[in-house]
Amino acid sequence: PSIEAMAETYALADRDPDLATTISPYTNEPINRFLHIANSSEDLFMQNEMQRKLGQLTGTCFQRCVGMDAFNALHSVTYEIDEKYKTNYHDKFINFLTKMHEGNFVIGGAMTDVKGDRSKPPHQQADQDLYLRVVNRDDNGVYVSGAKAHQTGCINSHWMVVMPTLRLTENDKDYAIVGALPIETDGITYI
């Protein structure tokens, strides 16, 4: 059912573009509404209507909601971080989002860490790979290790956005990573 549900997110956009597509502010071309950043109450209403229709059509999870919600959150959070710290995360995010619009890609959201001993924060776990974390940084970027759970949506996606599953403290800064990677990246194992 997961493959058919994902396919329906594309099929609905073809059958009912008024419901399941909108115009990208970055490419000025139609995009799937799952890739759109909500800018108004009408956008939010249309997202909800599209999700309701897909629920009626599929009767199951259609696996694109976490990616859509992550993009909407990252749009504002990257801007706020840049305002406060004079970084350029928002521009990087917009460039990535534009690439996703151009390719009509599916974004899976990898949020749920496997957690281990839930009474302990990530940095106190006996196995550090029970939460996704940064293990190296260099001029090419960051390298992560760890596990995420319940990732059927990512298997059916083009890209996955990884993000923390809980509030973190300064001691857990290596676990405070949000990033995107193609689902076929070397080193990713799906079980």
Task: Specify the residue positions occupied by each region the protein language model found.
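N-terminal-proximal low-complexity accessory segments that begin disordered
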Residues: 1-12
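Glycine-rich loop at the start of a catalytic domain that most often binds anionic cofactors/ligands
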Residues: 3, 31-38, 122-125
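FAD-binding core of flavoproteins
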Residues: 114-191
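Internal helix-loop-helix
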Residues: 11-107
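A short, Trp-centered hydrophobic/proline-enriched beta-strand micro-motif
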Residues: 104-117
